[in-house]
């Protein structure tokens, strides 16, 4: 079960626009994309089986090679359970699925993909 929770709208309009094609690819691969409706959420955290990670790193080249951001991996059972509970609390305010995109939108997103590594 692979799920990703993102804000429906972030504070970065260009990044919101550029992410559409990637999110649809993730859905096509079987990932459940959940868009959190209430507002901005800037958390960078995840759960993989019984391991959690939290930190400042975005999942992009800039964060890994230019900004030298870092994540903390957490193995403590109670801490992992707390993070899992937080994720589950977000779900009622999420809408599943990436909206369909028109041909023009998909074309524009393709152009934005060229610059995505530096957004």
Predicted feature locations:
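PLD/PLD-like phosphodiesterase catalytic module centered on the HKD motif
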Residues: 1-119
């Amino acid at each position: 079960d692979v799920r990703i929770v993102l804000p429906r709208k972030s504070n970065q309009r260009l990044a919101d626009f550029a992410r559409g094609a990637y999110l649809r690819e993730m859905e096509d691969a079987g990932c459940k994309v959940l868009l959190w409706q209430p507002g901005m959420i800037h958390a960078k955290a995840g759960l993989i089986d019984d391991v959690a990670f939290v930190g400042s790193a975005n999942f992009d080249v800039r964060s890994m090679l230019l900004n030298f951001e870092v994540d903390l991996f957490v193995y403590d059972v109670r801490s992992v359970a707390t993070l899992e509970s937080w994720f589950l609390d977000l779900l009622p305010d999420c809408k599943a699925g990436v909206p369909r995109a028109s041909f023009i939108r998909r074309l524009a997103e393709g152009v934005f993909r060229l610059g995505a590594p530096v957004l």
